[in-house]
A protein has these predicted regions:
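Helix-loop boundary and gating motifs at the non-cytosolic
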Residues: 1-52, 205-247
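Juxtamembrane intracellular "pre-TM" segments in multi-pass secondary transporters
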Residues: 1-3, 178-212
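Hydrophobic core of transmembrane alpha-helices in multi-pass small-molecule transporters
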Residues: 14, 80, 91-107, 295-311
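Helix-to-loop junctions at the C-terminal end of transmembrane segments
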Residues: 52-65, 150, 255-269, 354
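C-terminal ends and interior cores of transmembrane alpha-helices
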Residues: 75-88, 279-292
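Cytoplasmic helix-loop-helix junction between adjacent transmembrane helices
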Residues: 98-136
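Helix-loop junctions on the cytosolic side of multi-pass membrane transporters
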Residues: 162, 170-188, 378-386
């Protein structure tokens, strides 16, 4: 049963993250005639919706069923992709992006919590590495395909493929068994409340540090993903080159991430995570500096994601071990909510500075601000022992 759940979950990770439009979304929206103001409004609608609904949907999943929550979210994502394909009204698409935020909130933590409950804690680091590999492989394949699709302007084909992938995701989730938890989790779960979730966070420095890291990291990196293709296009790289760069970057990250179990067996996990986290910030700064030669941009982008893939499984396993099983969905949802907060703050920051600076400079400034919060939280998180 456990092996079947893990296999189905990894399949879910691959299919749910397959999106040919992801790295070329802003390019596509410009292609069909939307202004940058409209595009920014859509992005904000998604993040605000996710921010508002992350905790309520996680709470509902913990109380009434994680699998049902995940299925509702996947159906919502199907609606979002269909809207991207067919809708050309800015207001309706803003609504579709809000639907995406709701869908992501429903999926966030729900299926993952079923998977976490099916494996032992000492397996999490190893399986987290496998999960990251599957995650990056899905992104790499879809990014490479998306680059060719964007270059040819064949977005109908790409969005149709994304819809098919989401339908297959729905089938996989239906097949995932949701085990009824026994005495250790059932009783606390039924008595859980938002106040209990808040108290759990307030009394746990690991959770607080993880949430601060998620928020500050989103402030610096979410928009980097959203505007990645436009950034490279501004430096003279076409969509195919962008897609191939993303694919190489993701596959390199996944491959390097496989060495984490071996590496942490011989080095201090906390120190290893701190070094990788700080190196990632430095490499990202080199990618964003306007004077960096164009031919070095793919190199720095690949290396910064490799650094992240090396320490992410360690950071996440610390968070997973600190999250109480009876409210794990809710805590994972809070984690996702912090990502939404960071993204919203960046888009507001971008709106305030867009008239006096370009997106590359704004991202560089955001990276510097985020580092002031991220680095202390990283040190606090990795100095704890669970």
């Amino acid at each position: 049963m456990k092996n079947r759940t893990v296999l189905l979950y990894m399949t879910f990770v691959f299919l749910s993250n397959f999106s040919t439009i992801l790295y070329f979304l802003t390019v596509y929206l410009e292609f069909v005639g939307f202004s940058m103001v409209a595009i920014s409004s859509m992005m904000i609608a998604c993040q605000v919706s996710k921010f508002i609904l992350e905790v309520p949907t996680g709470y509902i999943a913990d109380r009434f069923g994680r699998k049902v929550s995940g299925l509702v979210g996947i159906v919502g994502m199907l609606g979002y992709y269909v809207a991207l394909l067919l809708v050309r009204s800015p207001l309706l698409l803003i609504g579709a992006f809000a639907l995406k935020g709701f869908a992501v909130a429903c999926v966030s933590g729900s299926i993952e919590a079923i998977y976490i409950d099916s494996v032992s804690q000492d397996q999490l680091v190893r399986l987290n590495v496998v999960e990251r590999f599957v995650f990056y492989a899905s992104y790499a394949i879809s990014a490479c395909v998306g680059g060719f699709i964007s270059s040819a302007g064949a977005y109908l084909i790409g969005l149709s493929a994304d819809i098919i992938a989401m339908v297959l995701t729905l089938v996989v989730v239906v097949c995932i068994p949701e085990m009824r938890r026994g005495d250790t989790a059932a009783t606390p779960e039924h008595g859980m409340s938002p106040q209990m979730i808040g108290a759990a966070i307030a009394g746990n420095d690991i959770l607080r540090s993880a949430f601060i890291m998620d928020c500050s990291q989103a402030f610096a990196f979410v928009a980097l993903e959203d505007f990645f293709s436009l950034l490279l296009a501004g430096r003279g790289m076409n969509a195919v080159a962008s897609g191939v760069t993303i694919a190489v970057q993701l596959l390199a990250s996944a491959s390097m991430g496989l060495i984490v179990p071996c590496a942490i067996a011989h080095v201090d996990k906390g120190r290893f995570a701190r070094i990788c986290g700080i190196v990632r910030l430095f490499l990202t700064a080199l990618f964003l500096i306007p004077l960096t030669p164009v031919y070095l941009l793919p190199v720095f982008y690949v290396l910064q994601t490799v650094a992240y893939s090396l320490f992410a499984p360690i950071k996440y396993s610390v968070f997973q071990n600190a999250a109480d099983s009876s409210m794990r969905c809710s805590l994972i949802s809070v984690q996702s909510q912090m990502v939404a907060v960071g993204a919203i703050l960046f888009y507001l920051f971008n709106a305030a500075l867009s008239s006096i600076a370009g997106i590359r400079v704004i991202l560089l400034v955001a990276l510097g601000i985020a580092s002031l919060v991220y680095i202390p939280a990283l040190f606090r998180l990795t100095s704890q022992r669970t």
